[in-house]
Amino acid sequence: MFTTTPSVFRYGDVFGITFSHGGTALKDAGEVYLCGTAIHDGGQKAEVSAAVPRNRMELISSRFEKYLYPKDFFGLPSDAVIEELYFYFINADGSIVVKDDENGGQEFFVEQSDE
């Protein structure tokens, strides 16, 4: 349902998020928006939680995709140190939210590579 491209990346890299919405509560949504939380600089939080044009995902075939640079996506300064990233998906009016059912309904954790 949720993958990253490339599979090996660091939080300082541009990467893509792919969301296969079939089989989720967003299966009939015409628009899907990427939302989430960045933990940075010793535990500070930056959140993106509204459906706005800059976090709208692009429908490609049967899935939604969004490429992002995390510091820009979360509005962080260039010297911010991102420690953790979490994402979830909403429809245009925010009435439907899809999170990680396999992890107790928490946001999807995106781990950077050790490489």
Regions found by a protein language model. Give the residues of each.
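Low-complexity, Pro/Ser/Thr- and charge-rich linker/hinge segments at domain boundaries
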Residues: F109-E115
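Aromatic-rich carbohydrate-binding modules that target alpha-glucans
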Residues: G30-D79, I90-F108
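Exposed beta-strand face motif in extracellular beta-rich ectodomains
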Residues: V81-F87
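A short beta-turn/strand-edge loop motif at beta-sheet boundaries
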Residues: F9, G22-E31, L76-V81
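Eukaryotic intrinsically disordered, low-complexity regions enriched in proline/serine/threonine/glycine
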Residues: M1-V8, S62
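Contiguous beta-strand segments within globular domains
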Residues: T5-S20
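Beta-strand-rich binding-surface signature
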Residues: V14, E31, Y86
